[in-house]
Amino acid sequence: MRFELRKRMEEGVPVLTWEGTEPDRASLRDLVNQWGYALEGDCQINLEAFGAQQFRGEVSEAAYFLVEALMQGAYRFGKKALGPGASQRLFELRDELAVLPQVTVYLIFSGEYGEKTDTDEGQGSAGSGREAGNEAKDSSEKNGRERAKEAVEHMVERARCLGRCRNYARMLGDLPANYLTADDLCLYARKLAAKKPALSLEIFREQELRRMGCGGILGVNQASGIEAALLHLRYQGAGRGPVTALVGKGVMFDSGGIHLKSMGGMEGMKYDMCGAADVLCLMEYAADTGCAGSLTAAVPLVENAVNEKSLRMGDVITMLSGRTVEVYNTDAEGRLILADALAFAAREADRLVDMATLTYSCQEALGDETTGYFCNEEELAEQVERACEAGGEPVWRLPLGERYRRQLLWSKTADLANYMPDKRAGASVAGCFLQEFVNGRPWVHFDMVGPAVLRKENGRLEKGATGRMFAAVARLLEV
């Protein structure tokens, strides 16, 4: 999929356009996703008209939004690339697994790009004041056009990078669980870090996790035949701003444990690692675009399996933070691994962002189109709202507070319980559980159970992992 800037419309090439009143950004994303989903041949878009109508004349911002949303709609999972040995070669196969159509999208941007205009032909006698004035004016206009062109080109390239990295995350989510175990994702991360000098990587496996005291990660994984892992990535930005930690839930498959899911409930549980995939690929995006801010990432990888070694109802585990947790529900495992990862990340970060397919309660409240989020600081919440509005990602802030927190304090044998007998307000109770482990840092938690996965085709995105919230978090990292 190519994007090419042109000054004039190309004859015979279909033009993508819209009708009706100016939509909000979320509706606009749906429209552009639909364009990308239907692409079968070359097309063109009048970038300046689009920017004037939708982005208050900010053509470079219009280009960014258009390109990444088109790539989101155009993605298809390349199932033909799967086969024997593919799980060991996912990094090498990723462009065959994350497929885009072989088409060219012409972005029509009619600025002269610094070429001569009629006024460049200098009038009047050499050295006259009028000629000098015209030359200064023309030079200013020329420089302005060149700067505008450079700005648009820069934003198109950033958007292409965002779209590519997001589609890699979707590809990881779409992989069958037997093609993407914790071992396989560790190997993928090693190859990624080897290709990206700006990224450093540490991988902690079970021996190190035991020494660290990561009881949440180890407890959830103890029935699995594959070792748990904690991926720790770092990116050093050129700026002096706060260090942001990204934390992504990586349950490679979730059976529910002893509290075994039904067949319907277990469907799609390979997607329970979409948060981990998003975080890993957001780190790649930051490295590729030279993000100004410094980042760290903590990505716990487990399988919530069931056998005689599984966590049991009533078991007490000791977390990385030193706090103890009674396991009341083995299918509330995501918060256990995130708690260890958040405590780990809080040691070196100034603010925390976690992404997780965490609770069905959030999906029941908000549906499949809107992501719920929790935040413990107003300034960060305002930044989240701006980033999501600009990216066209519908979100809704859900409450935290003592009325929900006290539902975690009933255990006689531990500091906290991971679940509550009263199942109401489950998303807020889960958010309060996570907040116990952020060590007072500014923190936002995205609960993406509904939007992260599309259960059936909708004419805008392919069924499967959607990459929702990726663009919004990418914008948040630039704040």
Feature map (PLM): residue ranges:
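A generic structural signal for tightly packed, nonpolar segments enriched in small/aliphatic residues
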Residues: 1-13, 140, 186-479
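Short amphipathic alpha-helical segment within the helicase RecA-like ATPase core
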Residues: 1-243, 247-250
